[in-house]
Swiss-Prot record:
Domain notes: Consists of 3 domains; the N-terminus binds the ribosome, the middle domain has PPIase activity, while the C-terminus has intrinsic chaperone activity on its own.
Task of the protein: Involved in protein export. Acts as a chaperone by maintaining the newly synthesized protein in an open conformation. Functions as a peptidyl-prolyl cis-trans isomerase.
Family per similarity comment: Belongs to the FKBP-type PPIase family. Tig subfamily.
Protein name as annotated: Trigger factor
Species, as recorded: Mycobacteroides abscessus (strain ATCC 19977 / DSM 44196 / CCUG 20993 / CIP 104536 / JCM 13569 / NCTC 13031 / TMC 1543 / L948)
Annotated region (Disordered), positions in chain: 433-490
Gene Ontology BP, a term: protein transport
Keyword field contains tRNA processing: no
Length: 490
């Protein structure tokens, strides 16, 4: 077999392949065996009919067609391997000549990874936000925790932001009742924004037993996107009372003995989330810095496929109704033209990033082993709240394991670049890249992965093993006493 490569553009080639018929003998043998099972000839058992009789029955052209169709994929793969091109997507194959007994020739046009020349990676410099925790952020975390242990108390006043109300709802569109919008005794936290637009504003100021009519656009159902007159009636109003932020609360709501220890733990949790955000920023800024230095042509066919996939995802929640998408964009002060432009720019950057990271992975000869994949699968299973084996089963069924391999390899590639780059925060301080990336080996060796894994671990008090049982006993006793005092108060 002979093959040559024509470069049609920086991202597309035509591979010309010539296959002597002598090399197709195994394909002919296979074709005759398959035909022998399919075609019944008098006097011969299934699978035993001679090739000449089979050919006489179905015709030489049918045999050739079967041989060629079976031979093309393998011969194309051989030609790709011999040419050292890196295809992107499926080829467009055209048989140009079948000279029976002599030669088969075909061409395969395919998008390929362009040649990308990497700059000196040690010259890459990025600046990111520092990891700092404000007292107000810790207080917000503490308030959120207190809210989980709060109690609701009925009030005899107008509803305010943050109150919990029981409401009845009904709606009409052009005088027609919207049945799916009618409900009674619905519990709602004012200010949560979890229900329809305009509801919170309508409720605030109402007392129990009062109602109000307001106009809003329905987001779902038969009348989605249409203006509706909504009537809301308040049944009851309750406010949430928060427990005092003291040592008793710390013991009730956590494994800590003092409010100071609890605040320290909350501080570390906030810091952990900010480290994840910083890691993501380092990754994004590093990629942007590289893309600014390198010209990367994008295959047009691959780009159009990516845009099509992104659009499919965008309208999936709208029952694939692009008119509804256009209406939503208009409501947001945007337009379909701006949306399409942003989508094209986003898809272009995404493809350039993937091409770039693949080249970097090749440069550093990055491999992905079983431990790499296991680490990533464990991390993903924590995020999704399922067992790793369930995740593996799902990815296998969806044929997404090869994609996972590629993602891990690209993650390790950007980690190598970050290690060579100069990373500082906006205060001018150097960022500890090793703390961001974690250990060099492993699939979690990606910006943010180590910090993300750490975020999953619950904060724990640093106590010695010898005192652990005593601490638990004392804490149980304190909680018991606190509960008794609360019961007496009631």
């Amino acid at each position: 077999m002979k093959s040559t490569v024509e470069k049609l553009s920086p991202t597309r080639v035509r591979i010309n392949v010539e296959v002597p018929f002598a090399e197709l003998e195994p394909d002919f043998s296979k074709a005759y065996k398959e035909l022998a099972q399919q075609v019944r000839l008098p006097g011969f058992r299934p699978g035993k009919a001679p090739a000449k009789l089979l050919e006489a029955r179905v015709g030489r052209a049918a045999v050739l067609e079967q041989v060629v169709n079976a031979a093309l994929p393998a011969r194309y793969s051989e030609a790709v391997t011999a040419s050292d091109v890196k295809p992107l997507g499926q080829p467009e194959i055209e048989v140009t000549k079948i000279e029976d007994g002599q030669e088969l020739t075909f061409t395969a046009e395919v998008d390929v990874r362009p040649e990308i020349e990497l700059p000196d990676l040690s010259g890459v410099a990025v600046t990111v936000k520092p990891v700092t925790v404000e007292d107000s952020e810790v207080e917000a975390e503490l308030d959120a925790l207190r809210a989980r242990f709060g109690t609701l108390k009925g009030v005899e006043r107008a509803a305010e932001n943050g109150d919990f109300v029981s409401i009845d709802l009904s709606a009409t569109v052009d005088g027609k009742e919207v049945e799916e919008a009618a409900t009674t005794g619905l519990s709602h936290e004012i200010g949560s924004g979890q229900l329809i637009d305009g509801l919170d504003e309508a409720i605030i100021g109402l007392k129990a037993g009062e109602e109000k009519v307001f106009t809003t656009k329905l987001a779902a159902g038969e009348f989605a996107g249409q203006e509706a007159e909504v009537t809301v009636k308040v049944g009851s109003i309750k406010e949430r009372e928060l427990p005092d932020a003291d040592d008793d609360f710390a013991q009730l709501a956590s494994e800590f003995d003092t409010i100071g220890e609890l605040k320290d733990s909350l501080t570390e949790q906030v810091k952990g989330r900010k480290r994840i955000a910083q890691a993501d920023e380092i990754r994004d800024e590093t990629i942007t810095a590289l893309l600014d230095k390198i010209e990367i042509p994008v295959p047009e066919k691959i780009l159009e496929e990516q845009i099509g996939n992104n659009l499919h995802e965008a309208v999936h929640g709208l029952d694939h109704n692009e008119e509804r998408l256009n209406e939503l964009l208009q409501e947001q002060g945007s337009s379909r033209e701006e949306f399409d432009k942003d989508m094209r720019e986003s898809a272009t950057k995404s493809i350039k990033t993937e091409l770039l990271l693949d080249v970097i992975a090749d440069k550093f000869d990055i491999n992905v082993d079983q431990q790499d994949l296991t680490e990533r699968l464990v991390l993903m299973s924590r995020q999704y709240g399922i067992e790793p084996q369930q995740l593996v089963q799902y990815l296998t069924q969806q044929q997404q394991l090869p994609g996972l391999y590629v993602d891990v390899r690209r993650g390790k590639a950007i980690a190598e670049v970050i290690r060579q780059a100069k990373v500082t925060d906006s205060t001018g301080a150097d960022v500890d890249v090793d703390a961001v990336l974690g250990p060099r080996r492993g699939g979690a060796d990606e910006a943010g992965a180590e910090a993300e894994a750490a975020e999953e671990k619950p904060a724990k008090a640093k106590k010695s093993a010898d005192s652990e049982k005593t601490d638990k006993s004392e804490k149980a006793e304190k909680k018991s006493k606190k509960k008794s005092k609360d019961d007496d108060a009631e």
